[in-house]
């Protein structure tokens, strides 16, 4: 399963910003084989979740130093709560699991109870509460045996909350600042921010899991779609560096190029983005020779970057000319003619150099005449 991104070139335009992405809908941006469908996935048996690692004998042995707790009674209460869960009385089961999590603190019962409480909230489509409960469990029980399931749930929640961005032809990077008092499947405020928090949680708590790179890719693409290109560049770069074997590598390279281009602010500002873009384009062409349909776009963008680097030298030379430092201007003119001799900026620089040569005798005469 791969994410498909089509990059097209705007006909007749060779500027740095001409190559724009035509991104797919949210359905194509999801590893669907790992994610339960929303809004109402089938409930997963609590017994199945527990059977992977639960042993009553080991359970009691681990916590026999807590004489104040009747762990056997806790286990029996948990099984009763599971029975209610299987009967799909999720609200009643949620209350039971909540009570167990408060009574059996710092025991495996607490871990399982918090997880099952979150499952009840998820299956009743109260996703903000479910997110909070999943996060509580992950914070306290790092490396939980429920981690894989929790990651899939968190990803599903994020995908649901961000679907308006990924399906829109003109996505907005914000939700209306109106509190949500009626839809319990969405948070009170900051819908997109909560979705990004869930994606971040996946990467922090399960960095080597099957959804870590998917979460990072969705985060990067979200920022790209809402035109926050510096943030998008940061996340695409993180994906390229942290997940070299990810199926999203080629797309992260292509959209990384676009993010860097859009982040460039012009010759008056730092030109580091141009250098990084040039390196990334070369890396993309070298690592992904099969991207033949994008090669022409990459080559044209590379040429545009080269022209912009030449323009930066020309603008710098002009700055020194205007500020009364002709010798410094000449240094940049010479550098421009040597590095980019086939550009119009080099031709302009050469004209300036020729003019400066004509002025040398005049300047010398003025110098000696000052002593007469």
Where are these regions (language model features)?
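Acidic, polar-rich low-complexity tracts and alpha-helical solenoid repeat scaffolds
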Residues: 13-372
